[in-house]
């Protein structure tokens, strides 16, 4: 082979090699995306997504209805057993329920305290509290002042979600610290909302179950003493029992005799109606009734002046067929009974909103009568 032929052959082979190499390179290299996008694949049904589910359960499914967490249950007594203090055991009973208020009495080993909750769409707060209250008045109607205005608490505030916090007039700070907490009580196991309230050196954990209300309280004082109160009994169709001392004429109509009786009042029952029945003999507690069956008590309440106010129907005078001595004893028996019920010394007794005035006794406008036990045998 001559030299030109050899060069021609080499040139053809070299060009073929370049073409083959170029073809192979084009087939092996993938195109490069200059701006890659990360693809997130949604979890398949059944895959574990615990964090997301817990977030949904604890926020989106929590009721925002205040009545779900602090319900108004008529004629229902709640009893709480406890450890760590003699005051850990107590009972609550709803005395009066209005559209936006709940008045209830809490009874423990030491005292009876009446509290009023006010409900709005966004919160439940205390608006009234009075310790040492052994009688029943509808304080929303009578307007009696709260004895501890600077100690009132906000119970719950929307939105109901973990992390929500608020400050109460008492100075305490409350926070929703957990939800769907499993809480065991003598009445059963509940899924509860946990609210932590702190004030000075005391921390309270309050647990509320939907539809039931407060089921448990755990109080930690100075990090040393733990006081626990747990719901131990729910009694429906119950009545509140309030003891009262009645004063009636003795058999000779010369003095007054004390008789112990008990009022049984349900939710929204005013005390005046049952007191009327006690005094007119309908209940059988009095041997000699003070009132006739025609007499009605128009109103009865304790005023901010610490005077018991009572107004009778006109039959109190019209049916008073007695001499001056017996009439005086009968009126004194009313004053002693009503004054004792409210634990006050003065009673303002009126008839149809006018001063009591009969042929034997005539009171002046605004004149009160004093509780007097000197004629009690």
Functional labels for PLM-detected ranges:
Residues 9, 60-61, 149, 173, ...:
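Residues at structural and domain junctions
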Residues 36-37, 44-240:
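Conserved functional acidic sites
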Residues 7, 67, 79, 272-280:
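Generic detector of well-ordered alpha-helical segments enriched in charged/polar residues
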Residues 24-56, 162, 223-377:
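Bimodal "functional hotspot" detector
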Residues 2-10:
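Bacterial N-terminal signal peptides that target proteins for export
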Residues 19-22:
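C-terminal motif of bacterial Sec signal peptides marking the signal peptidase cleavage site
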């Amino acid at each position: 082979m001559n030299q030109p032929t050899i060069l021609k052959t080499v040139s053809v082979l070299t060009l073929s090699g370049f073409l083959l190499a170029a073809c192979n390179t084009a087939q092996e290299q993938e195109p490069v995306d200059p701006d890659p996008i990360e693809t997130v694949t949604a979890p398949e049904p059944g895959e574990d997504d615990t964090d997301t589910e817990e977030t949904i359960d604890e926020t989106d499914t929590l009721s925002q209805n205040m009545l779900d967490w602090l319900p108004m249950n008529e004629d229902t007594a709640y009893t709480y057993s406890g450890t760590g203090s003699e005051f850990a055991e107590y009972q609550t009973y709803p005395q009066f329920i209005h559209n936006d208020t709940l008045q209830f009495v809490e009874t423990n080993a030491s005292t009876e305290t009446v509290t009023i909750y006010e409900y709005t769409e966004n919160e439940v707060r205390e608006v009234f509290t009075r310790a040492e209250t052994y009688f029943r008045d509808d304080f929303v109607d009578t307007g009696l002042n709260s004895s501890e205005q600077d100690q009132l608490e906000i119970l719950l505030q929307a939105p109901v979600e973990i992390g929500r916090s608020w400050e109460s007039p008492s100075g305490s700070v409350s926070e929703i610290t957990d939800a769907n907490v499993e809480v065991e009580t003598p009445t059963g196991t509940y899924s509860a909302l946990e609210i932590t309230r702190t004030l000075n050196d005391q921390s309270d954990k309050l647990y509320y179950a939907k539809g039931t209300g407060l089921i448990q309280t755990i109080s930690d004082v100075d990090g040393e003493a733990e006081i626990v109160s747990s719901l131990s009994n729910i009694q429906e169709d119950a009545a509140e029992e309030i003891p009262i001392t009645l004063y009636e004429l003795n058999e000779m109509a010369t003095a007054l005799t004390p008789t112990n009786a008990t009022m049984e009042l349900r939710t929204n029952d005013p005390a005046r109606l049952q007191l009327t029945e006690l005094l007119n003999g309908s209940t059988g507690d009095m041997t000699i009734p003070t009132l006739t069956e025609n007499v009605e008590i128009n109103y009865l309440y304790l005023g901010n002046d610490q005077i018991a106010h009572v107004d009778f129907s006109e039959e109190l005078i019209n049916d008073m067929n007695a001499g001056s001595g017996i009439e005086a004893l009968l009126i004194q028996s009313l004053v002693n009974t009503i004054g004792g019920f409210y634990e006050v010394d003065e009673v303002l007794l009126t008839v149809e909103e006018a001063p009591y005035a009969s042929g034997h006794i005539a009171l002046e406008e605004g004149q009160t009568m004093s509780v007097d036990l000197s004629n009690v045998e």
